[in-house]
Curated annotation (Swiss-Prot):
Lineage: Archaea, Methanobacteriati, Methanobacteriota, Methanomada group, Methanobacteria
One record GO biological process: tyrosyl-tRNA aminoacylation
GO cellular component terms given for this protein: cytoplasm
Summary of subunit composition and partner proteins: Homodimer.
Name by which UniProt lists this protein: Tyrosine--tRNA ligase
Length: 319
């Protein structure tokens, strides 16, 4: 169990609470859930949580992925027809990223979110949730707008009740999900249900250096991009000399390449110091001190990403 806990908590920002997670790990097949809005290309930001889902699966969890079509609709991501088309594409991408088809359940939100019992629970939750609390929980999820819609406060209430319907032991998400997860932990016990354990992963910065990688902003590397597209996007990515914080290229190294390989080879001409074999701490130190040039790092990251995402491209071409 100690090894499982170490793997599950690696590269996460917080677990609420570690003690409760230990209890969950004693179950035969606990359930971890993540919800995704089908609203665009699947990119490295999604792959960050999928990697953690794979680790949880290896630790004995059953994975439930909510393809949140109604949530995407409430968040202004397009027509239901288009959203459902994207849900099918999303499912293929998640399997291509290595989730076990036997131990992964994909659930379309609209398959249960209009049932009377579900609606009744949403109403009961609405009665004990303040308007301010519901609005605050959506601050990092809704699109920027001055013309706010009532849909923005329905969204978090539905997400909380989703956890009841899916029999969730652990809710996994990026830090933008934290306030909704805390709403679930606070109010589900008041409705007679157990509070989920919450695991929060970092948000991957966009290739333009903005706070979050997003398909709607175009600042992403898709998991099914071609090798040429990957190289071009990495080449153009924000990667300031000597800066590691908020640097998407450094984050790709930290959260994708190093966990997979443990060490990274940086190819450089002899006149610029020759090739390097670096562990994460060494790479961060060299980059922080400007001993490692952004272009050399980008070239190496491109090579690794092209290699790592090749199985995804092959899978997607075959389905």
């Amino acid at each position: 169990m100690d090894d499982s806990l170490k793997t599950i908590t690696r590269d996460v920002l917080e677990v609420i609470t570690p003690e409760e997670l230990m209890d969950v790990l004693k179950k035969d097949e606990p359930v971890v859930y993540t919800g995704y809005e089908p609203s665009g290309r699947i990119h490295l930001g999604h792959a960050l949580t999928v990697r953690k889902l794979r680790e949880l699966q290896d630790a004995g969890f059953r994975v439930k992925i909510l393809l949140a079509d109604y949530h995407a609709y409430l968040n202004g991501k397009g027509s239901m027809e288009r959203i459902r088309e994207l849900a099918d594409y999303n499912q293929k991408c998640f399997l291509a990223l290595g989730l076990s088809p036997e131990r992964t359940e994909f659930i379309l939100g609209s398959s249960f979110q209009t049932e009377p019992e579900y609606t009744d629970l949403v109403y009961r939750l609405a009665l004990i949730t303040t308007l301010l609390r519901a609005k605050r929980s959506m601050a990092q999820i809704t699109r920027e707008s001055r013309d706010h819609k009532v849909a923005e406060v329905i969204y978090p209430l539905m997400q909380v009740i989703d956890m009841v319907y899916l029999g969730v032991d652990v809710a996994l998400g990026g830090m933008e999900q934290r306030k909704i997860h805390m709403l679930a932990r606070e109010n589900l016990p008041r409705l007679g249900f157990d509070a989920p354990v919450c695991i929060h992963t970092p948000l991957l910065h966009g290739t333009d250096g903005s706070e979050k990688m997003s398909s709607s902003k175009g600042n992403f590397i898709a998991v099914d991009d071609s090798p040429d597209e990957i190289r071009e996007k990495v080449k153009k990515s924000y990667c300031p000399m000597g800066e590691t914080e908020g640097n998407p290229i450094i984050e790709i190294v930290k959260y994708f390449i190093m966990p997979e390989y443990g060490m990274m080879t940086i190819r450089r001409p002899e006149k610029f110091g020759g090739d390097l074999e670096l562990e994460l701490d060494e790479l961060l130190e060299m980059y922080s001190s400007s001993e490692l040039h952004p272009l050399d790092l980008k070239n190496a990251v491109s090579d690794y990403l092209v290699d790592m995402l090749e199985p995804v491209r092959e899978y997607m071409e075959g389905v």
